[in-house]
């Protein structure tokens, strides 16, 4: 796992499939909207980065559609086949 500082927030890069993580692209798209989420998933389609927030299953805000445990289903159902993607975990201990 790689620890990162992105726009003043600490994250760990816990998954980087097909080298999908691009710090410059993520920094430009990661807004305050994503701060409450425990995980940020980024996937690439048509040379565009898409971000989606997910919660840990123990988080009170967790629903079926944003539970990190459903990541594989999200990738299969909502992302381009064989796409590049990554998962960032918010570091709450900083």
Description of each model-found segment:
Residues 1-45:
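N-terminal leader/targeting segments and the first structural element of proteins
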Residues 8-17, 59-62, 85, 91-92:
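Compositionally biased, intrinsically disordered or flexible polar/acidic segments
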Residues 29-30, 34, 39, 59, ...:
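Acidic, Ser/Thr- and Gly-enriched intrinsically disordered low-complexity segments
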Residues 38, 48, 85:
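Beta-strand-rich binding-surface signature
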Residues 63-94:
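Helix-rich interaction surfaces within compact, conserved domain-sized segments
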């Amino acid at each position: 796992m790689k620890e990162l500082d992105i726009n003043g927030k600490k994250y760990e890069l816990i998954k980087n499939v097909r080298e999908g993580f691009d710090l410059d692209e993520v920094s430009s798209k990661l807004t305050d909207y994503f701060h409450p989420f425990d995980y940020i998933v980024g996937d690439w389609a048509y040379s565009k980065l898409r971000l989606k927030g997910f919660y840990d299953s123990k988080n009170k805000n967790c629903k079926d559609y944003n539970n990190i445990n459903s990541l594989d289903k999200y990738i299969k159902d909502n992302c381009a086949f064989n796409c590049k993607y990554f998962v960032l975990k918010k570091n709450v201990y900083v």
